[in-house]
Amino acid sequence: VPFGLARKTFYAKEVIVAAGTYNSQKLLHRMKDSRVLPLISDHLGELSRTNSEALTGAMMKNTDIDFSQGSAITSSFFPDEHTHIEPVRYGKGSNLMGLMQTIMTDGFSSKLRRRQWWKSFFANPSLLKSVLDVRKWSQRTVIALTMQNVDSFISVKPKRSWFGWHLTSTNDPEHPNATYIPAANEVVRKIADKYGGTPGGHIGDLVSAPFTAHFVGGCVIGESAETGVIDAYHRVWNYPTLHIVDGSTITANLGVNPSLTITAQAERALSLWPNKGDEDPRPIQNLGYKIISPVAPHSPFVPKGAVGELTVS
């Protein structure tokens, strides 16, 4: 407890975990590993996904066009049936992200990409300086956020080492996470050519460690604890009063921003909760899934007739 403050213990009949994919996984792995919640499914951390993403950017030489002005994402397109690309802008002053950029390289092998990096650097040493120049970076840069709806995933598990307890991830050998998406590099090069800028990748490219803005999964729905972490009503298997309601319950690479899917799943899960004092319409765990109609609240937060009124059908 920080600053010597007294520890407080809170009790609740129902507990919702909604800390975001990474932190929810971290908390639950801690609880399982320390035997506080030992019956959490062994599948915890499996089917974690990165939305099969690539982050590339085109950096212009000046701020004749201020790319920081406007909505963060204004459009998108699909270069093929599985790939979705969005031009993204950062607000003025958001320049720290630029330090993760580096000289753009191509290839499915990290060794090959490192060779390309050195070759490009020796051919034009000033290229690295221009890539790492983060002055007014957000005003000079267009990010190409690339996402794919392919079936790739990683497993996130706890590990103890000299550095203590931490989480580590491994690629699935049969469904490996994408480390190189050619369309992403092609698009950002075209943006750079159009505006006289420099295309850039990120430092993870050099070690086959893709970055993602949308880490999801790891606490997925299953028919039992042998196939998933939660049931179809978002109750943790073997702990039916513990609920997970965030991005960690997403079960696939969506290929788009997952925020609306996370919201839809959360709304569905909580719409099936009973009103206080009423009988729970959800079946007891292990009795199988059944379709349930949403439960109308007795005392809705938004009054009847007001804008944003909840309608249950």
Regions of interest found by a model, annotated:
Residues 4-6, 44, 130-134, 142-143, ...:
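Generic recognition of flexible, low-complexity loop/linker segments
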Residues 17-18, 132, 174-178, 256:
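Hydrophobic alpha-helical scaffolding
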Residues 198-206, 279-288:
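Short, glycine/acidic-rich hinge or "gate" loops at secondary-structure transitions
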Residues 7, 12, 70-72, 139-143, ...:
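Active-site lining segments that contact anionic ligands and/or coordinate catalytic metals
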Residues 25-27, 67, 155-156, 229-231, ...:
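Short helix/loop capping segments that flank catalytic or ligand/cofactor-binding pockets
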Residues 1-77, 246, 259-287:
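Glycine-rich loop(s) and the adjacent beta-strand/alpha-helix scaffold that form part
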